[in-house]
Amino acid sequence: MKRLRYIGTISILLSTLLFFSCGTTSQIINEPAEDQPLTQAPEPESQHKKHDKDTITLLFAGDIMAHSVNYYITTYEKIWRDVREVITDADLAFANIEAPLDRTKAASSYPNFNMTQKYVQAAVDAGFDVFSLCNNHTNDQYKNGILETIKTTQAITQYTKESFGNDIYFSGTKETADSKLPALTYNYFEANGWKILFLPITELLNRPDASDYINFIKPDSDSRKAFIKYAKELRQANPCDLFIISIHTSEPEYTRNITERQNQYYMDLLEAGADVVWANHAHIIKDRKIVVNTKNGRDKLIMYANGNTISGQRTKPELTSKNPASERDNTGDGLFYIVTMHREKDGSMKIKKCEPYFITTYINTANEYVIKPLNQDFVDYLYDVPRTNWAKYIERRIKINKEATKDLIEWQ
């Protein structure tokens, strides 16, 4: 019999228990000129701290977006400056790039996004290693935009490897729709002595164009059953320590509700061999669930949505509201979910620790959108500056996120 328990603490220790859209504006952006080199990150040669080889720490972010307001900043490095240490402390950090990267066109915002190479490079420099490229905005620039995205990500990968020796992984788009090639693109690599299999998919697209060039799985029952079978066979063909599936899910945006159909689908994927199901699309934070003592002795994890990591969706936060919990206010916060896993000698895998690290998109006095930790230290800073309305707002947002989302443990 399954038992589900709510865990109310920030850090979970399991070692012993074992009608809004994505838009705010619709315009072409003239990206500010930058005198800085392509990368800004300090000490990139030691991007991640090293851990015991039988232990791996993963950080899962949410959606990296770029609305017009996000481009108006002196340097993109500033976006990540106050959370970089948290990201680099993990062995691997994952994020979803929610836009094409077509260097032949100008940057653009909602409804047809196009992100710049430098914007994504800043996220890489901040410590992210693994990116999903498939979501409802992947084909915003049509087929050519997908092909240009692949070229841009290859350039980022090559530049980062040659300059700093760091391996970066992108998947979710395809160079050809030839049915003779593998149906979906994925990453299969080794990190810190762990073999990782990463497979991203999207269940929705904003237009039908070039869907064959994207890891697109329709959300109907037959397509999901076929994907479960595919995932099982993929793991069998690629022996790994961790199999992570990213899903840009066909569920309503801006709601914390989790449907039983959605939950069962993710549980079926765990049963088929996935160790982690990492879902996004809601643009707000949802619950997490740790599945303990599964039949094969492997602890597993579901993240239902980690919200926006960076965006311009919250342009007018309700600073003076006593309960700033509107849909737009919720889009301004995100989650870094930090998971520590341990390989046992008998081949089982245990989740030792899960830490929800809440973040928020802050609009500074220069009207720049930057990521800040959603914690008391940031509140104290705001009172000292002083930006009293912001301080009170962040206090309320901390309370809302702690009360509205939770970590669950399910024993099987």
How would you describe each model-predicted region?
Residues I29-Y142, T149, I156-S163, D167-F170:
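N-terminal catalytic scaffold of extracellular/periplasmic and nuclease hydrolases
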